[in-house]
Amino acid sequence: MKVLAALALSALAMAKPTPPMPGMSLVQTGPQETRWVTAKEKHDMVMNHIGFFDITNRPESASIASKPKSYAFPGNVSHQAEVKPLLEKISADHIKSNLEMFSSYPNRYYDAQSGVESAQWVMEQAQAVVGNIQGAKVEMVKHDWMQPSIRAIIPGKSEKIVAVGAHQDSINGKNPQGEAPGADDNGSGSMTILEALTALVSDQKIAGGEAANTLEFHWYAGEEEGLLGSQDIFQQYSQEGKEVVAMLNQDMTGYGETMGVITDNSDPNLTKFTKMILDTYTSAKYSDSECGYACSDHASANKAGFPSAFVYEAVVGQDNPAIHSPDDTIEKLDPAKMAEHAKLVVGFAYELAFATL
């Protein structure tokens, strides 16, 4: 009977709460801060760059804040001979060409047909990149809304996961289903990691499954509406006992001069490692910066107990002012800057793919 009672209490705790009014969302804006908001209030938060988790479908996650496991990340790079030839394959022109297509959709809103179509396009590109690699796969991750997340998996010798992620959705802050090319936010990050994946799988050891760890590349749905897709993925990984040893987030990579290395809601040891990768494999200048609670998808990994890092296009406050509007277009972006971010991703992924963690 005690077991049945415990199960009943557990089911009650997991039940979806009833909003005060239809259409409201439960958002978390701090470790102990949750509140119900209307659709307008939620989109005002987006326009005002207030980070939040939408936990309407995962209310139990409000009390989840697992401390990320500590790993001894490498203190030195070990694979320059293998990585540097891959960096030469990074093409700013190719990133630009892909981004022109990706930002041509009217919007990539998470609950619109155009958001579904843009996700399908990403999946097709990723499949073309990894389709001939034995054991590799690209799959859709379905959610409770229209747009799926996309996941590419390149198996290694272990099931430990090194993940790279970027959100694929876009939003018009004044009219969520209005025009939102989202070239920088976050077409730039999405195409940056696609370019990095293309370079990485040209390496015979990566393609041959000889890496110590498994590589995953994620394109998340619904980031703009409260980190929805990344929450689903990392909470599921946590529940399934999967071991994500590192996650690198790429959200906006095309604007500004000095990259921002985000130091809040991220893992300090992984961030230190990431700076070493920047110094070794890119020509980028960077400075420390903070982006606040739940500002992007690395926060979902961090909350689920996985070490994460985030390198942003600029120090917060010096980033692209045109995001969340019809003016977030490719003409304002620097493809060479995106290529430097892609080099970061290649170095990060390769070094950790072969690291003993």
Curated annotation (Swiss-Prot):
Q: Which CDD domains match?
A: M28_AAP
Q: Which UniProt keywords apply?
A: Aminopeptidase, Disulfide bond, Glycoprotein, Hydrolase, Metal-binding, Protease, Secreted, Signal, Virulence, Zinc
Q: Where is this region: Disordered?
A: 169-188
Extent of the signal sequence: 1-15
Glycosites: N76, N186, N269
- Record GO terms (molecular function): aminopeptidase activity; metal ion binding; metalloexopeptidase activity
EC number(s): the record gives: 3.4.11.-
Q: How many and how are cofactors bound here?
A: Binds 2 Zn(2+) ions per subunit.
Q: Which cofactor does it need?
A: Zn(2+)
Provide a GO CC annotation, any one.
Answer: extracellular region
Q: Detail the disulphide connectivity of this chain as listed in its UniProt entry.
A: C291-C295
Report the top EC class in one word. hydrolase
Cellular location of this protein? Secreted
Binding of Zn(2+) 2, residues? D185, E224, H324
Q: What's an example Gene Ontology biological process for this entry?
A: proteolysis
Positions bound to Zn(2+) 1: H167, D185, D251
By sequence similarity, the record places it as follows: Belongs to the peptidase M28 family. M28E subfamily.
> How the protein assembles, per its UniProt entry?
Monomer.
Q: What does this protein do?
A: Probable extracellular aminopeptidase which contributes to pathogenicity.
Q: What is this protein called?
A: Probable leucine aminopeptidase TRV_02148.1
Organism of this sequence? Trichophyton verrucosum (strain HKI 0517)
